[in-house]
Amino acid sequence: MTFARAVKNKELAYISRLLSIFGVVEERQMRLLFQHLEAKDYGKIMTRLHREGMIYRTPDAKYLAPSELTAMRTDRRNSVLCFWAFIQIRDKAQDFCMGEPPTIITVASKSTDYDLIPLSRENIALINEQVEDMPERSVRYLITDDLKLISGVERRFRNDYVLHIQDDGEIETYEL
């Protein structure tokens, strides 16, 4: 089942849920994720969320967040990179929830779980600590815009991937 079919008529709830998990995303990313909606319908949803105080737009209108405080405190770079990865795997998602740090989100599909983990200098130690605790069937996506960071990551036997994300959302996938 595609993401569009799964969220049909529940887009408002899904947008709120995704913003609460990711913290900050780019406006263009959210529009891309919900591209199945006509512009008019998407606009109505965003207007309603804004009117009810459930969404905050940065002054430059580039980012969306659940609140101004969240927009100021969230690591934008990592949230945006992980959201690009979520867009990439959205059709595999049957359900998703906030992950245990450093994982931002865990996406469940029929046969496996996907953990989207931002790869940064600050996260490497925590990522390496959790390598033994991860179920073997879980796929670990380490998300970065700097491939030099992967040299410090301990590799599992299988199901470890690096998603190298460009500024335009272009994604290159490498097995770790």
Region roles according to the model:
Residues 1-18, 154-176:
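Non-catalytic C-terminal interaction segments of nucleic acid-processing enzymes
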Residues 114-170:
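Catalytic cores of nucleic-acid endonucleases
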Residues 3, 27-28, 89-91, 114-115, ...:
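N-terminal start-of-chain detector that recognizes signal peptides
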Residues 14-21, 54-129:
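Nucleic-acid-binding surface
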Residues 1-72:
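Nuclease-adjacent, charged terminal/linker segments that flank catalytic cores
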Residues 5-12, 39-43, 75, 79, ...:
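Short, structured coil/loop segments at alpha-helix boundaries
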Residues 34, 46-50, 85-93, 131-134:
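Hydrophobic, Leu/Ile/Phe/Ala-enriched alpha-helical segments that form helix-helix packing faces
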Residues 16, 43, 47, 86, ...:
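Generic detector of well-ordered alpha-helical segments enriched in charged/polar residues
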